[in-house]
Amino acid sequence: MKKIPNKLLAVSAFLTITTTYAVIPIETFAIEIQQTNTENRSLSANEEQMKKALQDAGLFVKAMNEYSYLLIHNPDVSFEGITINGNTDLPSKIVQDQKNARAHAVTWNTHVKKQLLDTLTGIIEYDTKFENHYETLVEAINTGNGDTLKKGITDLQG
């Protein structure tokens, strides 16, 4: 049976607790849009799923920010000179793993986080754009106005 390192267990427990109890407001990623019509209907069949996905993404970003901060700002833990159940190469592997984790945390902070937030922003902007064009598209379909429909779809694409 393979033993799981205590540090891995501690980090996993920390991330689980952080993501379970840390709540980031959904308003950070999505602004609620109120409809002016009096009907109680949803424009998006997956509106609740979208809200849940955005909320989960917000929790993920928060957890990754905290984790990367800890990795970058905490010193290396060294077990050099300690024999760990016959695993003589384990201390050097731990040091290398810490260096790799720190490099990944820097990559998260400098590249990945921005790409993720840009993607989430793009999704929200498209959703808003779609909601703004929805009534016009439905009306164009119902009246058979092909030109308006083409223009609306073209606007959504660009």
Swiss-Prot record:
Keyword Signal: yes
GO-annotated cellular components: plasma membrane
Family matches, as InterPro entries: Enterotoxin_cmpnt, HBL
Sequence intervals crossing the membrane: 120-140
One Pfam family here: Bacillus_HBL
Main subcellular localisation: membrane
Subcellular locations according to the entry: Cell membrane
Name of the protein described by the UniProt record: Uncharacterized protein in hblA 3'region
Upper lineage: Bacteria, Bacillati, Bacillota, Bacilli, Bacillales
